[in-house]
């Protein structure tokens, strides 16, 4: 078996295992159980972020305590700025800045973006966690569709990029990512969203549009973490997931696209109220 086929098989087995857990939790667990899972996942993501950095243990402990306070104070922060907390808006702002630098500045990301900058990790992962808490209270099928839409984009980009990719999209930022892979991911995602809109009553036209608008940010999450890893001199953020690397390697696109999904949803619903 070729190395490419072996890698794809390993990634597929891991993806199926993760998908089974995610589907079971989203469709059959209570809000409390799902929120506990989201909290544990977010904590693991932040621990992995800190493990890649070269900061002192004292600094890591301080930020770890701060992170736990943030995600455990969801009701407090959510009550300040309903339905999006102030922390979430800061995280979304960071992703908008990242998107601007990727698409309009040829991928020249700010030097402030690094694994050693715990403030960035704190904001982005906290925003992801708080948005997931918010989405759990809505239709579970829509939440599942959002998660799988991003996974479909990643899978389509990976398969097409590996087999047909020739032209780098942003060679200085991530030379292995290709234009062909990007197109493959976008087409796969668009097909998935159309099917979700046609066959799932929980996915309204507005929901479908938010899923489409969020996909460029899935790309941003992917490129952003590629930049961070290149800057830190590491290939993966961990090794817990066979074929994928670390948790951050698996959910890098979700960290960006899920908060932006809620942002666009609120934006479109607000705009719709004026017409």
Feature locations, PLM:
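Membrane-embedded alpha-helical segments of transport systems
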Residues: 153, 183, 221, 248-256
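Hydrophobic alpha-helical transmembrane segments that constitute the membrane-spanning cores
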Residues: 192, 196, 260-265
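Short amphipathic alpha-helical segments
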Residues: 207-215, 219, 223-227, 246
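Juxtamembrane boundary at the C-terminal end of a transmembrane helix
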Residues: 264-275
């Amino acid at each position: 078996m070729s190395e490419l086929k072996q890698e794809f098989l390993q990634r597929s087995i891991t993806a199926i295992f993760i998908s089974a857990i995610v589907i079971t939790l989203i469709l059959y667990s209570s809000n409390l159980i799902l929120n506990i899972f989201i909290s544990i996942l977010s904590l693991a993501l932040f621990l992995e972020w800190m493990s890649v950095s070269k900061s002192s243990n004292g600094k890591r402990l301080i930020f770890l305590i701060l992170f736990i306070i943030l995600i455990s104070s969801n009701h407090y922060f959510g009550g300040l700025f309903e339905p999006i907390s102030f922390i979430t808006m800061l995280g979304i702002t960071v992703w908008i800045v990242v998107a601007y630098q990727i698409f309009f500045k040829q991928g020249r990301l700010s030097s402030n973006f690094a694994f050693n900058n715990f403030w960035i990790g704190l904001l982005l992962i906290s925003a992801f966690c708080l948005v997931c808490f918010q989405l759990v209270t809505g239709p579970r099928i829509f939440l599942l569709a959002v998660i799988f839409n991003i996974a479909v984009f990643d899978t389509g980009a990976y398969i097409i990029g590996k087999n047909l990719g020739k032209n780098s999209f942003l060679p200085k930022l991530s030379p292995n990512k290709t234009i062909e892979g990007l197109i493959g991911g976008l087409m796969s995602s668009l097909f998935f969203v159309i099917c979700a809109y046609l066959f799932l009553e929980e996915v309204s036209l507005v929901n479908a549009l938010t899923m489409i608008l969020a996909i460029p940010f899935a790309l941003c999450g992917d490129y952003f973490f590629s930049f961070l890893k290149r800057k830190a001199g590491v290939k993966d953020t961990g090794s817990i997931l066979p074929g994928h690397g670390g948790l951050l390697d698996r959910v890098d696109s979700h960290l960006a696209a899920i908060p932006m999904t809620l942002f666009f949803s609120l934006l479109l619903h607000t705009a719709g109220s004026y017409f």
